[in-house]
C-alpha cells in the first residue's frame, strides 16, 4: 500500500509528492557532503498531439514508454519521477555537468520510437532544462524554478533540445 502511495500508477515512477520530499533530502545531502548534483525537468515534445490524434490510451502508453526510456538513461540511484502530465523530474546526486550533459545528448539525439496499442509506431523526443547544484541553488524551490526557466528556453529552440540554467539568459 505504501508503494502505491509513493509511485505513479501509470509509469511506476515516484509521484510528485514522494519525489518532492526525497529530492529535498537529496539536495540537503549534496550540500552536507560537498557533492555536485544535476536537477532536470524533462518535457515530452508535442504530447498533446499524441492524445488528440491517437487517444488517451495511446498517450498513457507513450508516458509509460518515456518512463522506461528515462530509467535506462540515468543511474539506478537517481531520483526519477513523473511530475504531472508529460513532465518528468530527475535529480542526480553526485553528478558533474559533463556527465549529465552526456546523458542528455544521448536522450535528445534523435527521436526514439514508441509502439502504440494498435501497433502503430510514433517518434518521441524530449526537451530538458537543467539546474546544477549547488551553483544554481540548493533549495528545492530554487533549483526547480531555475530548471523550469532553462526548459522554457530549450523548448523555444524547438524539439529535442536541452539547456542549462544561465542567470543572464533565464532571469
What is each residue range found by the language model?
Residues 5-8, 45, 49, 109-111, ...:
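Residue-level signal for pocket-adjacent positions within structured domains
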Residues 39, 88, 126-130:
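A structural signal for short, well-ordered beta-strand segments
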Residues 82, 97, 109-127, 155:
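Catalytic core regions of nucleotide second-messenger enzymes
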Residues 34, 74, 115-118, 137:
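Residues at alpha-helix boundaries and short interhelical turns
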Residues 2-6, 12-38, 45-75, 81-85, ...:
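Conserved long alpha-helical elements within nucleotide-processing catalytic cores of c-di-GMP signaling
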Residues 13, 41, 123-125:
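Short aromatic/basic micro-patch
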Residues 80, 120, 127-157, 163-171:
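Cyclic nucleotide signaling catalytic output domains
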Amino acid at each position: 500500500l505504501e508503494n502505491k502511495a509513493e509511485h505513479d500508477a501509470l509509469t511506476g515512477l515516484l509521484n510528485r509528492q514522494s519525489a518532492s520530499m526525497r529530492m529535498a533530502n537529496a539536495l540537503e545531502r549534496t550540500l552536507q557532503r560537498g557533492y555536485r548534483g544535476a536537477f532536470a525537468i524533462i518535457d515530452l515534445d508535442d504530447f498533446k498531439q499524441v492524445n488528440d490524434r491517437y487517444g488517451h490510451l495511446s498517450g498513457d502508453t507513450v508516458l509509460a514508454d518515456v518512463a522506461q526510456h528515462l530509467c535506462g538513461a540515468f543511474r539506478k540511484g537517481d531520483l526519477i519521477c513523473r511530475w504531472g502530465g508529460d513532465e518528468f523530474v530527475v535529480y542526480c546526486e553526485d553528478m558533474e555537468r559533463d556527465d549529465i550533459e552526456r546523458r542528455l545528448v544521448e536522450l535528445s539525439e534523435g527521436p526514439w520510437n514508441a509502439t502504440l496499442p494498435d501497433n502503430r509506431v510514433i517518434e518521441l523526443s524530449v526537451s530538458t532544462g537543467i539546474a546544477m547544484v549547488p551553483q544554481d541553488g540548493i533549495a528545492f524551490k530554487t533549483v526547480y524554478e531555475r530548471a523550469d526557466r532553462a526548459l522554457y528556453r530549450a523548448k523555444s529552440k524547438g524539439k529535442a533540445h536541452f539547456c542549462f540554467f544561465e542567470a543572464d539568459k533565464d532571469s
